[in-house]
């Protein structure tokens, strides 16, 4: 019994060895005796496979044909479904990286630093521009509650996006060496999520704010005079203007509308990558987004400077909605005259009661 079992095991082992030997011999003969010009499975799947095999024999370690095929951006096979999911490597990504790191970041940083430096130098030279006349104590409504609410919505969301964007754009250069990798990674992730959620709110607020102030921002002839004299910033010369001067109108049309819409549109392309846009479109959107944002921050720096420490009483207009008559007469003479004639369209503050017959359309408020 034991002899028969031992004999069977021996025969099985012998036949198994012969089978694997024959299989290996056939594979070797098939590889060495393949007809000239015949394509192997690998060469059919990857046309550069034979080229890579030859390159490995001539220059071991040189896998240039493989990477040439990878960088060709040809669509191959993947179980993932999506735009460009079959493209292993997109060559435009390196071009985008070089433009972002070697052009946008250095130039944007220099431009922002230059504008902030110019504001600081101007303040050191000119200081806060005080009223030439004493305040009268009679206050005029310049902005109603809705106008101020929309302005502050845009201001707060813009400031949030600006700070978070600056961290993501310049943080690797400025913050990382100071706070270390762990804290910087946490801060950058927080800024990215904050940026993504606040961005759409800013976009909507920009549109509402544009139509809120559109009526009083149409260009007029006297705006050319204001621009020629630079609003009296360098000469102390009185230059009349309407409810908004030419400088504020430039900020409205170029900064709020032009750059604001550009930043919003490009940001939405980046924020929602599930609308069939490819990587090339998102790389272009990123370049446009960064460039437009830097320009908008530069213009906003001038706007914020003039509205806070640059001009006395300007911040009160957006804080309380009211300005002194002396301020209105000195900075917006034409609007003041219309106001006093009862032709201004400034609404009455809520809760002040009906306007008496014959009174100006915009009500005054005693300090």
Which ranges hold each PLM region?
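Hydrophobic secretory-pathway targeting helix
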Residues: 1-32
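Membrane-embedded alpha-helical bundles that constitute the cytochrome b-like, heme-associated redox core
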Residues: 2-5, 29-367
């Amino acid at each position: 019994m034991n002899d028969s079992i031992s004999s069977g095991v021996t025969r099985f082992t012998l036949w198994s060895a012969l089978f694997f030997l024959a299989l290996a011999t056939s594979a070797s003969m098939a590889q060495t005796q393949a007809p000239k010009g015949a394509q192997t499975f690998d060469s059919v799947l990857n046309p550069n496979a034979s080229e890579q095999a030859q390159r490995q024999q001539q220059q071991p370690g040189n896998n240039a044909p493989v990477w040439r095929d990878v960088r060709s951006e040809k669509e191959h096979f993947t179980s993932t479904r999506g735009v460009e999911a079959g493209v292993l490597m997109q060559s435009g990504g390196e071009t985008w990286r070089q433009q972002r790191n070697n052009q946008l970041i250095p130039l944007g940083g220099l431009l922002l630093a230059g504008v902030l430096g110019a504001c600081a130098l101007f303040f050191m030279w000119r200081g806060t521009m005080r009223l030439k006349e004493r305040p009268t104590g009679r206050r005029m409504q310049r902005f109603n509650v809705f106008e101020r609410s929309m302005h502050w919505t845009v201001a707060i969301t813009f400031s949030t996006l600006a700070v978070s964007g600056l961290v993501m754009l310049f943080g690797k250069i400025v913050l990382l060496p100071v706070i270390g990798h762990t804290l910087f990674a946490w801060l950058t992730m927080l800024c990215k999520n904050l940026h993504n959620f606040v961005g759409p709110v800013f976009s909507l607020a920009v549109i509402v704010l544009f139509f809120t102030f559109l009526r009083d921002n149409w260009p007029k002839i006297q705006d050319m005079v204001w621009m020629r004299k630079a609003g009296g910033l360098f000469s102390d010369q009185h230059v009349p203007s309407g409810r908004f001067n030419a400088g504020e109108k430039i900020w409205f049309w170029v900064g709020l509308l032009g750059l604001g819409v550009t930043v919003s549109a490009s940001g939405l392309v980046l924020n929602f990558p599930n609308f069939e846009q490819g990587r090339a479109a998102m790389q272009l959107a990123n370049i446009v987004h960064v460039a437009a944002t830097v320009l908008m921050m530069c213009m906003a720096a001038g706007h914020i400077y003039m509205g806070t420490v640059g001009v006395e009483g300007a911040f009160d207009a957006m804080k309380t909605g009211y300005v002194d008559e002396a301020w209105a007469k000195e900075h917006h003479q034409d609007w003041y005259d219309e106001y006093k004639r009862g032709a201004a369209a400034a609404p009455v503050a809520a809760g002040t009661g009906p306007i008496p017959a014959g009174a100006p359309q915009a009500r005054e408020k005693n300090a």
